[in-house]
From Swiss-Prot:
UniProt family annotation: Belongs to the mitochondrial carrier (TC 2.A.29) family.
List of residues that carry N6-acetyllysine: K148, K157, K170
Segments on the Mitochondrial matrix face: 32-73, 132-170, 231-267
A single cellular component GO annotation: mitochondrial envelope
Single GO MF annotation: O-acyl-L-carnitine transmembrane transporter activity
Organism taxonomic ancestry: Eukaryota, Metazoa, Chordata, Craniata, Vertebrata
Name of the protein in its database record: Mitochondrial carnitine/acylcarnitine carrier protein
TM region positions: 13-31, 74-93, 113-131, 171-190, 212-230, 268-287
Length: 301
């Protein structure tokens, strides 16, 4: 296996991880909106077509009815959360690696990298859950014709007033179920591909931008291949009226399989996979570029 990344300062981690996260959200949010609307659309009545027939139909209708701003609905919530979330994400991955090293020069196996990635998923849940909750509510209200919330802060304020802190953190368990294994797959795949793509005699840190894009994009696809079923459950649970699912994700899972079959757990699959490659390619390239710039501009930071 090729060389491990060198330790970086928390401030550099914050700045580079935040920049990578902003790149991810900006590139991927339109298809994330499509994904959430597909996952949360109500079952069609007998003899009537569904609200959206698929990814491209949802994209087309959203663009036609709401314009380009409709595709970026609810983006403020993930943008606000990405800087600390991605800083914590990369910090958690680095900490997970360090905890498994007996000596600083030890090279970790791929199962160890997977475990380190899982730790990053635990770290990010506290930031991710409220952002996802608000984002999903804002994304579906436009398609449903309701306008309960005027924006991100208004949504957070009303959730807290109505349900307290638990209302904002609704879906925490499902976020953990999604992000812990998916983050393990995410980082392990990225490190594996970086090692594969590194030419003979070169270091991983010298990998070209196109190869970073490909490694990051494929890592995103592997991440979402693991994350889609719990993500469907999370989206449905977080946007449901209070009290609809008293037993949590078990009730959501039971209802989905009963009413729509096992394939309902992969609602929005096309939108997710179309989004996964460019969004995560942008994330990792943004992170790597920011880190190189910071190491050049402020080597002692």
């Amino acid at each position: 296996m090729a060389d491990q990344p060198k330790p970086i300062s928390p401030l550099k981690n914050l700045l580079a991880g935040g920049f990578g996260g902003v790149c991810l959200v900006f590139v991927g949010h339109p298809l994330d909106t499509v994904k959430v609307r597909l996952q949360t659309q109500p079952p069609s009545l007998p003899g009537q077509p569904p609200m959206y027939s698929g990814t491209f139909d949802c994209f087309r209708k959203t663009l036609f009815r709401e314009g380009i701003t409709g595709l970026y609905r609810g983006m403020a919530a993930p943008i606000i959360g990405v800087t600390p979330m991605f800083a914590v994400c990369f910090f958690g991955f680095g900490l997970g690696k360090k905890l498994q090293q007996k000596h600083p020069e030890d090279v970790l196996s791929y199962p160890q990298l997977f475990a380190a990635g899982m730790l990053s998923g635990v770290f990010t849940t506290g930031i991710m859950t409220p952002g996802e909750r608000i984002k999903c509510l804002l994304q579906i209200q436009a398609s449903s014709g309701e306008s309960k919330y005027t924006g991100t802060l208004d949504c957070a304020k009303k959730l807290y007033q109505e349900f307290g802190i638990r209302g904002i953190y609704k879906g925490t368990v499902l976020t953990l179920m999604r992000d812990v294994p998916a983050s393990g797959m995410y980082f392990m795949t990225y490190e594996w591909l970086k090692n594969i793509f590194t030419p003979e005699g070169k270091r991983v840190s010298e990998l070209s931008a196109p190869r970073i894009l490909v490694a990051g994009g494929i890592a995103g696809i592997f991440n979402w291949a693991v994350a889609i079923p719990p993500d469907v459950l999370k989206s449905r649970f977080q946007t449901a009226p209070p009290g609809k699912y008293p037993n949590g994700f078990r009730d959501v899972l039971r209802e989905l399989i009963r009413d729509e079959g096992v394939t309902s757990l992969y609602k929005g699959f096309n939108a997710v996979m179309i989004r996964a490659f460019p969004a995560n390619a942008a994330c990792f390239l943004g992170f790597e570029v920011a880190m190189k710039f910071l190491n050049w501009a402020t080597p002692n930071l």
